[in-house]
Amino acid sequence: MKYNYSRGENKVAIIYGETFASVLKKRPVTTESIVVLANQRYYDLFSEKINYAFGEQLGLNWYICRNDVHCNDLSELESVLRFLADWPENQDVLLIGLGNEGVLQLTAFLHQVSKCSSECWLMPVSVQALRQGLLPSVTIQQAQHATMHIENHSEEILFDSTLTNKKGAAPLIDLLVFIRAGLVCDYTYLQMLYQTYPDKKRLNQTSFNGILDELLSLYEQAGEKVDQFGRVFEAAFATT
């Protein structure tokens, strides 16, 4: 499925319900170079699948980030800019961010400041990470505090459920994204969530793909308001 999502004046195509490989078959990549930024954990889990999907595509490169959700910091940005320093300025590069919220923010920020970037895709491994891709701006942090903001101009978000983290508490953390949107925007949406995921068994067995469309609509209407819900309490707990 494809959802044409508006981040203010900025548009992004969100593709979900199909695999990354099937997307590539429909529209092969033609850029000269591909750089995939990924957390170490997701590189270990999914790099073979990504490499296979691209097939004989030349110029596929990996940049590995630490697993921390706060990897979108100044030191990591400086490191990846050094990594890209040898690329010719006139060479088209497709940037792909594969992983958690930190990698997605780092990739989208790099897309705006790199001398050689031409296109940016985000591949979140959770709904929590997908939420970050929906927001109109991304940040670079220092000591876990935002120091630089820039508009999020990523062109595509590919949410492949076969590349998501489904272990442990991950499904419950993803469900909280839907609950937060329901609390802020739509009480009937909360009721639907309770009926669809009444217990842990149903949560682990039922895909989120069937309810993503409405989540995207709610974020399109009030994404920043939803994202800020509860942040005051989080900040208070973090400083006590």
Question: Each predicted region: which residue ranges?
Answer:
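Short glycine-/acidic-enriched loop or helix-start segments at secondary-structure transitions
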Residues: F46-E48, L106-A108, Q132
